[in-house]
């Protein structure tokens, strides 16, 4: 029998308390109320979940948490969805620096998750974000085989905020990429959304064209992604550069343009 205050009793109590405390901490994390929890039954999230049912290979929770593990599907993280949408539609600074704010603040939330947002547009923008991730991974995997230009591209993509900045810049360049006026950027979608990996490859072809000019975007992230004016100016500079070489890249851009629903 252990006496009160004995070293053995103290050891036994500590041994029991440690895993118990871990269980409590894990439960507290799981039970933490997130802004997305409070929006999960919002009419827009309910509608978007329904729209995603057309694509059984894709999964969008709309902020609703489920203990069931999703398997063999492309999972769309709701916070990353909101970030990429906000960046694509003009505010990569808030998208990068305040991702929870998008779900928390009514104004930011309703600007993104409105009646005009569709599952197809989410797929369009989210696949761009994934293409940037994979483009960066491909550069990393080249290791010593990277060219000097590729080293510079990897250095750019490794900077804080570069992904959201690049998404915003691509959006600014969309008219030049498609060769036509865009009346409503919220209606930009792929014609066929069944193969997500193929859509990512479509975007990679665009990154192959734009990334060599990444230096035009550098001033916007030299001290972190902080200035909306700086990001807008940098994106416009990239657009001007692309436009000046548009005839040179016309054939290279045509497959991407053909894959987009131009009924806008």
Predicted segment positions?
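Residues at the C-termini of beta-strands that transition into short coil/loop
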Residues: 13
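C-terminal accessory/interaction regions of large nucleic acid-associated machines
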Residues: 165-264
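An N-terminal structural lobe/cap that precedes and organizes the functional/catalytic core
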Residues: 8-10
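A sequence-level detector for short glycine-anchored, His/Arg-bearing signature motifs
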Residues: 1-2
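C-terminal catalytic or substrate-handling cores of phosphate/nucleotide-
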Residues: 16-180
